[in-house]
Swiss-Prot record:
The gene is egsA. GO terms for molecular function: 3-dehydroquinate synthase activity; glycerol-1-phosphate dehydrogenase (NAD+) activity; glycerol-1-phosphate dehydrogenase (NADP+) activity; metal ion binding. This is Glycerol-1-phosphate dehydrogenase [NAD(P)+]. NAD(+) binds at residues 54, 116-120, 138-141, 147. Catalyzes the NAD(P)H-dependent reduction of dihydroxyacetonephosphate (DHAP or glycerone phosphate) to glycerol 1-phosphate (G1P). The G1P thus generated is probably used for the synthesis of phosphoglycerolipids in Gram-positive bacterial species. Prefers NADH over NADPH as coenzyme. Is also able to catalyze the reverse reaction, i.e. the NAD(+)-dependent oxidation of G1P but not of G3P. Does not possess glycerol dehydrogenase activity.
């Protein structure tokens, strides 16, 4: 097992917590990662290889990787997913069917060449075809590379399906450093979203009896802290900054994989992001980077949750429930602190900066909690009229 995965597994074991085994055989984060990928497929004797890309990732990484594989005697072919009417590649029925239909027989392994959306499509397709897949990220933009969950759009609704994790991941630092600043900032935003997701997870433990892992929370908290500590390096896209960001994203994904759920990394801020994504698709508007939406939602929710912890409407709750809510939310950083971090990394901090209007944000705030059967501060506010009447929508 590789170091990053071994460290995560060991942290759970040292805490005496039982988890699913982490079966990502190899994780390489460094220079010339493609060399390690070639060595890996040779050892696995994977002869027929399908690389799944979009037009952009095909240009920046897919062509070169396909050529290198074919020069080594493999039968490799790039499968480029076409854009939709809004000019996006999305993980929806259209893209999933395209990949399933055009993945030829025989295929020994699939390679996801891209960022979050490409990986969601490939992990679902590989799961359906009972094939292993390899992760080859092109930007440090999301934490889902090493997870098994595939958030996809089915019949217009964002749904997360547990599928499979990659058998191996090869992340080239030079390729990641060359990613657009917006995608680096999105990865940072996805990590800052852990501020609210971890608080929501704590609440779900006490108020709904949902599964909780102290070790998992600690691992994700430490990964988040590392990113905040290296905000300037991440903003400057130094080798250290990109390594810290990418490793933190990978660790978050591995924790989700070990626990077989996304609670430590996905709370109310992700539900708001998903709702807005669905609205953009319905209106056939271009998509916004996942991490950018998550970061903006975290800014909104930290301030809202701090208000919730102080709201006298909580007097309607039992003492134990009230204390749990106050304990989880009253020490969250102010939204303006998160906004400063996000802007330092070159990303947006508020929804109006990414073209999402106030009506859309209010709509997401009122309805996004219905996307997942999960206890979050967002759900508590929306399902308790006492709190609503005290102005927490404003």
């Amino acid at each position: 097992m590789n170091r990053i995965a071994a460290d995560v597994q060991r942290a759970f074991e040292n805490a005496g917590e039982k988890t699913l085994p982490i079966k990502v055989e190899e994780i390489v984060l460094g220079k010339q990662a493609a060399d390690s990928l070639l060595d890996y497929v040779k050892r696995k004797n994977n002869q027929h290889i399908v690389l799944v890309c979009d037009a952009n990732t095909h240009r920046i990484a897919g062509i070169d990787l396909e050529n290198r594989l074919n020069q080594e005697g493999f039968q490799a072919e790039c499968l480029i997913i076409p854009e939709n009417e809004a000019g996006d590649v999305t993980a929806d029925e259209r893209s999933l069917i395209h990949v399933l239909i055009h993945t030829k027989q025989p295929t020994d392994v699939m390679i996801a060449v891209g960022s979050g959306t490409i990986h969601d499509i490939v992990r679902f397709a590989a799961f359906q075809r009972d094939l292993p897949f390899i992760s080859y990220p092109t930007a440090p933009s999301v934490d889902g590379f090493t997870s098994a969950g595939a958030p996809i759009i089915l019949y217009g609704t964002k749904t997360t399906i547990q599928t499979k994790a990659p058998s191996a991941l090869f992340a080239d630092l030079d390729l990641l450093k060359a990613a657009p600043q917006s995608m680096v900032a999105a990865g940072f935003g996805d990590m800052l979203g852990k501020i609210t997701s971890l608080a929501d997870w704590e609440i779900s433990r006490h108020l709904a009896g949902e599964p909780y892992s102290p070790a998992g929370a600690k691992i994700v908290q430490e990964a988040l802290a590392a990113c905040i500590e290296h905000t300037e390096d991440i903003a400057m896209k130094t080798e250290t900054g990109i390594r810290v960001l990418m490793e933190s994203l990978l660790v978050s994904g591995l924790v989700m994989l070990a626990l077989d759920h996304s609670r430590p990394a996905s709370g109310g801020e992700h539900h708001i992001s998903h709702w807005i994504e669905m609205e953009l698709m319905e209106k056939k508007r271009p998509q916004i980077l996942h991490g950018a939406k998550v970061g903006c939602a975290a800014v909104l929710l930290t301030d809202t949750y701090r208000k919730l912890a102080q709201d006298d409407g909580l007097n309607e709750f039992s003492p134990s429930r009230r204390e749990a809510i106050q304990s989880a939310y009253q020490t969250l950083p102010r939204g303006e602190v998160l906004a400063d971090w996000l802007r330092s990394a070159g990303g947006p901090a508020y929804f109006d900066e990414i073209g999402v209007g106030q009506d859309s944000v209010k709509n997401a705030f009122r309805h996004a909690h219905t996307l997942r059967d999960r206890c979050t501060g967002l759900r508590i506010i929306n399902e308790n009229k006492t709190l609503i009447n005290h102005g927490l929508y404003e």
